């Protein structure tokens, strides 16, 4: 069966750029990859066809030969040169398939694990710091103890016993990866001998057993700025795990969690609290002390105050950590009904109730409520 034109296979024009070729090939590889189409012979053939087309068109010399002579210019069976051996002059599919595999499995090829040999950055650490509301609002300094990995002192992080040193891996030549030939294309894999490090330790350190790092807990002083809230993070640069083979140390992220307060609730820069008052103070008005984070302040209660009435104390909230003026303290009134009354108190309340009978002028909502009840039952 005659071969299709390589440009047609990839769905591109003859003058397409290298970037366009790569984009087209990647799209086809994603669509027809065997991992996505198991037992689908048609997709398998399309996948192979796309591989063959891209290997030729991504190589400048092969592309020039193909453009001039067609398939005969690149197919040795037809008298052409080159072929599809995937040798030194062949196309390198590893970069493309790094992206393809990333899309398959949700991650790239980078990171602290494998990758190319040599120094590797240490992992970042996370520490949850519990604070009370006062500490979060005012700021504080806290000492924390964090388990981590540090460089082994006897071998100075090399992993090799004192007097010896790691040697270059003969399998990968210190790169940390090896090229594997798979059909028409080649991919790079982590070296199975050095596990991606590029070095081999023949005489490992007795303290770290060749790892170059050991577990240790260290105490750190964390300065918490005023105004932090739950979810805020403080970054301590260079306080994460030590890097492998002399790589840079990771960072430590201290994540703030503010505990619930017995009196105040926080919403951003504003605070809220409930203030209980007697029904006599609510009816007659008065003055009472309410708590704030700065101490007690006096709050004037007008006569006839109802449950749910909210009073705003400006500037008595929280000054945000990222700047700006302090929020407010919102005090919600809750009128308390007296209990455990004495005989005299009951008598006085009975007299008071009698004096209010048939007089709705003293109730701010009664008339409207009773009218609503009448309409409700009238509609039934």
From Swiss-Prot:
The keyword Cytoplasm applies. Keywords: Chaperone, Cytoplasm, DNA replication, Metal-binding, Repeat, Stress response, Zinc, Zinc-finger. A zinc finger (CR-type) spans 139-217. Gene3D superfamilies: DnaJ domain (1.10.287.110), Heat shock protein DnaJ, cysteine-rich domain (2.10.230.10), Urease metallochaperone UreE, N-terminal domain (2.60.260.20). SMART domains: DnaJ (SM00271). It is found in: Cytoplasm. GO terms for molecular function: ATP binding; heat shock protein binding; unfolded protein binding; zinc ion binding. InterPro entries: DnaJ, DnaJ_C, DnaJ_domain, DnaJ_domain_CS, HSP40/DnaJ_pept-bd, HSP_DnaJ_Cys-rich_dom, HSP_DnaJ_Cys-rich_dom_sf, J_dom_sf. Its cofactor is Zn(2+). PANTHER family: CHAPERONE PROTEIN DNAJ, DNAJ HOMOLOG 1, MITOCHONDRIAL-RELATED. Homodimer. Belongs to the DnaJ family. This is Chaperone protein DnaJ. The lineage of its organism: Bacteria, Pseudomonadati, Pseudomonadota, Gammaproteobacteria, Pseudomonadales.
